[in-house]
Amino acid sequence: MSTTDMKDVVREKYAQAALRAGTTKGCGCGCDPKLSDPVTRNLYDAAQIGALPEKAVLASLGCGNPTALAELKPGETVLDLGSGGGIDVLLSARRVGPTGKAYGLDMTDEMLALARENQQKAGVANVEFLKGEIEAIPLPDNSVDVIISNCVINLSGDKDKVFREAFRVLKPGGRFAVSDIVTRGDIPADIRKNLLLWAGCLAGALEDKDYTAKLAAAGFTDIGIEVTRVHKAEEAREWFKEIGVDFDKVAKQIDGKTVSAFIRATKPRGCC
């Protein structure tokens, strides 16, 4: 399974999600409501999403609420890795205010088009959506105060490069504050090789200790992982069936081993 193959599958799945945003009740990791509901429900309160365009909410593909985690302040510059339909970028733009800036980075043309449509409908000026990959962030060194991401880093085939790039663009003292899927315990190799499971935020998820080690190797300090939800295999029974995976065969191997988590880290002050 090559990195290119993984990227193509992910791009296609999330392009489909963008196109469906106006006609479905939502789509989470894996772009299938049967899988997404247990992962994505109750992430945002009504006050947060009430003023957002409906399509921004419907296209939400996350597993957490990094805008709440990040403790954004007025005047800060924030970057959302894998910004999708733009929900977290628009929420971040509110928090940093007119003196701040919120960037969204996505590799999928359909998602970028949807995000820019949502930005226009929301009437938010301090937002910019960039096309690119999270392994090669198109921003200069030391230019961002906070990096957020919502259930996207697990989709990358080169997470070490993602963390190095995040470290590079953060200012000294900058904060890494993401929601992601993390595993606890071994996931069988045949599951990790399944491209559709990768696009569904399962096969590519790092084990918690590996996530911590990779962040540290990139230079981050003050690393913490807080589990917010444990996912049971039964929640995804129908989705496994649809993609042709024998649920009864894999259920015991994955049950309770994937969790939604908040991951925090800091780029040291006085650093590069």
Residue ranges and their predicted role:
Residues 1-42:
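N-terminal auxiliary segments of SAM/dcSAM-dependent transferases
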Residues 15-20, 27-31, 214-272:
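C-terminal lobe and adjacent flexible extensions of AdoMet/dcAdoMet transferase-like proteins
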Residues 58, 63-65, 73-136, 161:
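Class I SAM-dependent methyltransferase SAM/SAH-binding core
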Residues 78, 147-148:
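Hydrophobic beta-strand segment of the Class I
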Residues 92, 151, 166-167, 215:
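Class I S-adenosylmethionine-dependent transferase superfamily signal
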Residues 97, 160-175:
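A short glycine-rich, Lys/Arg-flanked "PGG" loop and its adjoining helix->strand segment in the class I
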Residues 154-155:
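A short His-aromatic
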Residues 182-202:
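Short, glycine-/aromatic-enriched active-site segment of Class I SAM-dependent methyltransferases
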